[in-house]
Regions:
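Bacterial N-terminal signal peptides
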Residues: 2-13
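Mature N-terminal segment immediately following signal peptide/propeptide cleavage
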Residues: 17-59, 74-77, 512
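Hard-cation-handling environments
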Residues: 428
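N-terminal leader/propeptide and maturation segments of large enzyme subunits in energy/redox metabolism
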Residues: 375-400
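Extracytoplasmic/lumenal domain signature
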Residues: 46-59, 91-113, 127-132, 150-181, ...
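Repeat-blade elements of multi-bladed beta-propeller folds
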Residues: 22-26, 67-88, 115-149, 182-208, ...
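N-terminal, intrinsically disordered, basic low-complexity segments enriched in Arg/Pro/Ser/Thr
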Residues: 13-16, 164
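Short, solvent-exposed loop/turn elements at domain surfaces
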Residues: 29-36, 58-63, 92, 271-272, ...
């Protein structure tokens, strides 16, 4: 491995991970998604075949929740076992060489309840350095559940660790002013620093001004005792009505050597109207660095002021070395990348506040400026009528007329009563799939979406009539009541015509590689970009996608994520797709790779995504080279 690669991984706190391991969600605590394995490379990747397949049976018995279930998990390899979670928070331990089940734990999620999200992105592992070898619960697997529990399991047996909380679990709803029981959840694996388990929460959007608070909590990994809390919007306590959320629902990163945890936060409630939460709304829409031991704020960097567009920081912060400084990269739904000094939060490149259009909605006061960055955006950030697209001229003209009817003055155009074009849409840009960092080629690699959305504010007194009309016309957008605000909202993707195709030029999804070094003229550039998958047969390439990439020292980028059911490999230097394999279902997850007994495997959870409308299933598929 090159010296730079070693330097980056050590800085990210991954020294304890062997080359063949994948012991954390992003492989290392810094979320680089970089593996030093080289057995599978550009010369032999076409010889990959299915080594084993495991079926979780998570969708049994059939329930209405299956319609929104999403198998988004990335397995981890820890102390010789492969651990993963299902959309219903079952935790499974597998033999990494054969896929044979070692144990399975079921938390008995109530499948007749209504949950905002039905997913789990994975589990976290911890070995107690004070416990004797072979002791019960010396190795622990932690999962946060969609019914808001934090559970600790014995890594060897899958049985709950009785000394943690109450019989192995903590009820995370205690002390929370719940508005709706199924809208306060945990969907991402917790972060572990020393003997602390640190977790955020997933809070259902667009329901009301007064929502649950997005407080981050740290618990003792042995006992479950609460050690500290951190409130992302402490100023909201003094407001009437009190805004909520600003929750950290994505995956955190940690620099264990510096004792720091990096937390991505979402928008304050409600997402699309801020008249009840004046100001810049710090520390919503930010990456914050906390002292892991105490929860004390070290610094904060806000990427969107007074968010009106649902531009949460969804991606896991990526730890890397930049200009010979320990850094953290913030990858956003807007397609912007910010690289900050890990110790101070100061940008390590040029950023600036740019003037933005004002709101024309009574009661709203949009923030007058938003940040721009030296790095080239990963996705388009504006669209006009001339950019309308359709398979036929009639479809293109229909899309053009729709765009002409909207308020569309660039990325940060505030929501309006007539309808505003959101470019990019609220799914990104880059979502929770995050980025992979290749230290050998100085690349930041991410999956991106290029589908604008339309959002329209609805005066409260007109909401019932609008909902009735939408039912009559079979409209498939989403209403958000935003109770407590003078306006509800309606949003929908910018798709039209008889085939419900995007009104934007393809590709509608792409994988991109951002060069972390400037070109000869000092400019930022994309080293390459390539369409990712297909939305449907017969359409141009480039699919909506949810999930992320990984990168290996073998010169390969692996990703699934697209709506079609394939795992793909790309050449890290050129972006050329050089291999793909069909999966039993779509892979709306991030793959991982590891080596056992001298053989490298690439594993993906292929279970589809109910909300995306992709092919559903319950498979975990491992690929390896033939004998």
């Amino acid at each position: 491995m090159h010296f730079l690669a070693i330097l980056v991984l050590l800085a990210a706190g991954a020294a304890q991970a062997g080359d063949g391991d994948w012991p954390a969600y992003g492989r290392d605590p810094g979320g680089t998604r970089y593996s030093p394995l080289t057995q599978i490379d550009r010369g032999n990747v076409t010889k990959l075949h299915v080594a084993w397949t495991y079926h979780t049976h998570a969708l049994e018995p059939q329930s209405q929740l299956n319609e929104k279930a999403a198998f988004e998990a990335t397995p981890i390899l820890f102390e010789g076992s492969l651990y993963l979670s299902t959309p219903f928070d079952q935790v499974i331990a597998l033999d990494p060489a054969t896929g044979a089940e070692k144990w399975k734990y079921d938390p008995d999620i109530n499948r007749s309840a209504n949950y905002s999200e039905v997913t789990s992105r994975g589990v976290s592992a911890w070995a107690d350095p004070k416990a004797a070898e072979g002791a019960v619960c010396r190795s622990r697997i932690f999962i946060g559940t969609i019914d808001a529990r934090l559970i600790a399991l014995d890594g060897r047996t899958g049985k709950p660790c009785d000394g943690f909380g109450e019989h192995g679990a903590i009820d995370l709803t205690r002390g929370v002013e719940l508005r709706n029981r199924g809208d306060y959840q945990v969907t991402s694996p917790p972060t572990i620093v020393d003997d602390l388990v640190i977790t955020g929460s997933s809070i259902g959007d667009n329901r009301a001004v007064e929502l649950e608070r997005g407080i981050v909590r740290a618990f003792d990994a042995r006992t479950g005792k609460l050690r500290w809390t951190w409130d992302p919007i402490p100023w909201a306590e003094k407001q009437k009505p009190r805004t909520g959320a600003a929750n950290a629902w994505g995956v955190f990163s940690a620099d264990r050597a510096r004792g720091l945890v990096f937390i991505p936060t979402g928008s304050a409630s409600p997402d699309f109207y801020g008249g009840e939460r004046p100001g810049d709304n710090a520390y919503a829409n930010s990456v914050v660095a906390l002292q892991a031991a105490t929860g004390k704020l070290v610094w904060a960097f806000q990427v969107v002021h007074h968010d009106l567009w649902d531009y949460d920081v969804a991606a896991q912060p990526s730890l890397l070395t930049f200009h010979e400084r320990p850094a953290v990269a913030v990858i956003t739904k807007m397609g912007y990348v910010f690289v900050l000094d890990r110790e101070t939060g100061k940008p390590l490149h040029e950023v600036g506040e740019l003037p933005m259009p004002p709101s024309d909605v009574p009661g709203e006061k949009a923030w007058p400026t938003q940040l721009g960055t030296w790095f080239r955006p990963l996705v388009p950030q504006k669209m006009g009528p001339a950019d309308a697209w359709g398979l036929t001229e009639e479809e293109r003209l229909q899309c053009r007329a729709w765009i002409e009817s909207l308020r569309a003055e660039g990325m940060y155009t505030p929501p309006s009563l007539r309808g505003t074009l959101l470019v990019p849409g609220n799914i990104g840009g880059v979502n929770w799939g995050s980025a992979a960092i290749d230290p050998e080629h100085n690349l930041l690699i991410a999956n991106t979406n290029r589908l604008p959305f339309v959002v329209r504010l609805i005066p409260r007194e007109k909401l019932s009539g609008e909902i009735d009309e939408a039912k009559r016309n079979r409209l498939e957008g989403e209403f958000g009541r935003q109770t407590g605000a003078p306006y509800a909202m309606y949003r929908q993707p910018l798709i039209g015509g008889p085939r419900d195709l995007p009104c934007t030029n393809p590709p509608w999804g792409a994988i991109v590689a951002l060069d972390l070094k400037p070109d000869r003229k000092g400019r930022s550039r994309l080293r390459w970009e390539a369409p990712l998958g297909f939305l449907a047969p017969g359409l141009p390439p480039g699919s909506l996608n949810l999930g992320g990439p990984i990168v290996t020292a073998g010169g390969l980028v692996f990703t699934a994520a697209a709506k079609d059911p394939f795992l793909r490999a790309f050449d890290v230097e050129t972006g050329r797709e050089i291999w793909k394999a069909e999966l039993p279902a779509s892979g709306q997850a991030t793959p991982m790779t590891y080596a056992v007994a001298g053989k490298q495997y690439v594993v993906i959870c292929a279970g589809g995504h109910g909300k995306l409308g992709s092919k559903m299933g319950d498979a975990v598929v491992a690929f390896a080279l033939g004998e």
